[in-house]
Amino acid sequence: MKYGRFLLLLLVACIILLISGIALKIFLVQQPFLAEDVPDWKVQELTPYKWELRSVDDPERSTTAWITRPEKMQCDTLIIVGGVEEGEKLLSGGGKWKYTGNTILMKQPVHSFLLRHYWKNWDLLDWWQIPEKIREETRHTLGALDALLNYVKGAKPEDTRFTDKVVMAGGSVGAPFPVILTSFAPEKVDGLMVVYGFTNFQRVIQPLLFNQGLIHYKLTENSTDFSMEVKITGLRLLTDFFSFLLANMLKYGEMETYLPNISGTPIHFINGTKDPLVPPEAYLPLWDNSPDPKSDTWVEGGHFNPGNPEDMLRTGKLMYEWADAQKLRSCKTVVQ
């Protein structure tokens, strides 16, 4: 009897210790980024339209930036960080991309890194370190974007491609990166755009996990079958828990933490009126915590679809018009 009680107490102590360890880990990893956290990266032009960005301290980490620009013109520059799936084809946009001037799209470095460190090969220690791994990927994305910004902003006088005006934009899950970086050095960024961006990660993540669970287990949400209702309730509780956990892991990416530190840089938000990923409670904290000058545009429809040429046309036009209204647009012919 005493032995059984001892085992029970030992089990309870182990559970409490595990929960405390997880809570401490999440608390440490969720702290906001500071300017000194941004690692050094460098830029190499492979061709006039394709650049390589690589970490200085960890050369295994690299990514690509694509540039589209008018020939023989010196123009302002728009630097874009897209969502997790967006790459070179985003700028082609089925021939619909209409932002004139220099447009640079940076692919998030997480793509190439994960290809070499595929999660199916992870051991238990790797999974335990996943909060730190995600934060490290975010940190290096900031480093790559910082290198790109400094490369364009610090162009030599003989480089006649760029004016001194740079606008940064982040789309969807790529939105936090320009915001975080701008908060560290707002004087470097002449305009900031948040395109279909969001905060309140738990509110965004939970429906995604829940819907994927319904599909995976072939469940129907409105079913009246008792056994199916039990499964759906269990699935909802699990997705509530994991979305809460993930949201707290990613708290350092909440843009409302950094937006108040931006001064003198105009900020513009582009949102969908019926975006299932970005309900009002996932956007309003961004607006409320943004300093003036700020503005927003509401586009009829759902979340931005980079594969839809009409979305590309509409979004590019809105970005162009806003930058022009802020007097950030300029292009002039370069005499060779």
Placement of each model-derived feature along the sequence:
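Short beta-strand/loop motif that positions the catalytic acidic residue
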Residues: 262, 268-271, 275
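Hydrolase active-site cap/lid region
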Residues: 180-242, 298
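Histidine-bearing beta->alpha loop at or near hydrolase active sites
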Residues: 299-312
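Cap/lid segment of the alpha/beta-hydrolase catalytic domain
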Residues: 89, 102-143
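Gly/Ser-rich "nucleophile elbow"/oxyanion-hole loop immediately N-terminal to the catalytic nucleophile
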Residues: 128-167
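Short, surface-exposed "cap/lid" segments of acyl-processing enzymes
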Residues: 70-100, 105-108, 113-116
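N-terminal cap/lid segment of alpha/beta-hydrolase-fold proteins
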Residues: 35-71
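Short alpha-helix in the alpha/beta-hydrolase fold that links the catalytic acid
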Residues: 93, 279-288
